[in-house]
């Protein structure tokens, strides 16, 4: 089975009437995701027109939407200034799985949100992430559905576009994926590498794992230690930013080298010490996986 979501996951879209929310809601519906409703304050009672004559109701609040639809997941396409409140509203409404796509949420907001989400017992993916996709089952977020293939490789990444690149490499070489997860590149995120590694380790349909990290922080080193101690499946890793200069932010808010711990070389060395096969470039993934398996 996939991790975190499956073909029965019932999804709400917060911000469904906005430009991004409406576009990606239709994309998710076309993929086959069970989208059961949307939430936009002031638009309650209206309907959202999906592809092929389908439609779903729009609600004013998350509490109302969850009560009416029984949704067990939500995805957030809300502007940064309001996204923290949207996450907290979802957690307060009892949604167990929250995916925050929004980029640019202030770190101080997330410092307030993350403890609240944990207190409510919800799982948060993101923010500033592409979401996740279980090939042939469900898609939540912005990952393109046409590059995936059903299979047994779990993919977890801090980078959205690098996820797409590596998944494309796998699919074109007839290597399918069990679940592809983008955890996001902000300094404060919910679900992390270790959470995903643990889930993939427990998943009977995942035979090997691809982990894509980047410069900044020590999440990759922590994940490598977890792999060494707890993961028996083959793991292949890549670190983005191998030529990045220290002190300069590279794309993500969290992708900045501060001291030796955040460098690509330090992270790759931690991978090697944990028995993780290390890619020098994304196109190495196919050969390394085949060798590992």
Where would I find each of the regions flagged by the language model?
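Catalytic-core regions of core metabolic enzymes
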Residues: 1-293
């Amino acid at each position: 089975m996939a991790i975190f979501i499956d073909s029965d996951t019932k999804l709400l879209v917060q911000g469904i009437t906005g430009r991004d929310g409406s576009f990606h809601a239709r994309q998710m519906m076309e993929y086959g995701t069970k989208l059961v409703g949307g939430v936009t304050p002031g638009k309650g009672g209206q309907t959202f027109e999906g592809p092929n004559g389908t439609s779903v109701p729009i609600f004013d609040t998350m509490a109302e939407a969850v009560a009416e639809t029984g949704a067990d997941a939500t995805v957030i396409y809300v502007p940064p200034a309001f996204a923290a409140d949207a996450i907290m509203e979802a957690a307060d409404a009892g949604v167990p799985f929250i995916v925050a796509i929004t980029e640019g949420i202030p770190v101080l907001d997330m410092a307030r949100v993350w403890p609240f989400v944990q207190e409510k017992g919800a799982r948060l993916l993101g923010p500033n992430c592409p979401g996740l996709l279980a090939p042939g089952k469900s898609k939540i977020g912005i990952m393109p559905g046409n590059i995936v293939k059903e299979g047994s490789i779990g993919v977890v990444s801090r980078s959205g576009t690098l996820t797409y690149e590596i998944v494309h490499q796998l699919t074109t070489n007839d290597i399918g994926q069990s679940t592809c997860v983008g955890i996001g590149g902000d300094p404060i995120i919910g679900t992390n590498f270790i959470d995903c590694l643990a889930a993939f380790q427990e998943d009977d349909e995942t035979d090997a794992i691809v982990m894509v990290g980047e410069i900044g922080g020590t999440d990759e080193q922590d994940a490598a230690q977890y792999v060494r101690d707890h993961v028996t499946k083959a793991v292949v890793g890549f670190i983005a930013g191998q030529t990045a200069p220290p002190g300069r932010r590279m794309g993500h808010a969290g992708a900045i080298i501060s001291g030796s711990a955040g460098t690509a070389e330090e992270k790759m060395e931690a991978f090697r010490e944990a028995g993780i096969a290390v890619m020098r470039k994304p196109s190495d993934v196919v050969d390394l996986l085949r060798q590992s398996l």
